[in-house]
Amino acid sequence: MITLNGQWKMKQVKEKEWHQGTVPGTVYTDLLTQGLIVDPYVGENEDEVRDLSYNDYLYEREFLISKEVLNNERNLLICKGIDTIADLLVNGKQIGICENMHREYEFDLTGFLKEGVNRIRVYFHSPMKYMQKLYEKKPLWGVTSTVPGYQY
């Protein structure tokens, strides 16, 4: 078994500069650790970082695959708690989509891996934009003091 937990690089999709990321972790934690945002848990700082959820983010890392691993009958990627809307790519090819952080995803990497250096990318779509888009298609009744579409 190979774990992909640990150090990744991450960035806001529309920016050029990459930052250090940690998996498991969160965008907010990674930005906070590097001093790129104020601590959202202090005072009313939450208001200052709220708009970050309207951005898309990219996490990426390289990992090595041996010939022995490549010759396995199957190689699976198991993802636990990807929050929330994400496309997963290995070596530039889409292997799957995640749409619910409260479940475990399993992706068969047969045919996607190569011997040597491989690259995985996780493209996180803005949860706010995702909710708004679904809400516009089918509005649902809910608590009025929160974000429209939160049910999605």
Give each language-model segment a name.
Residues 2-14, 27-34, 54-152:
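Accessory beta-strand-rich segments of carbohydrate-active enzymes
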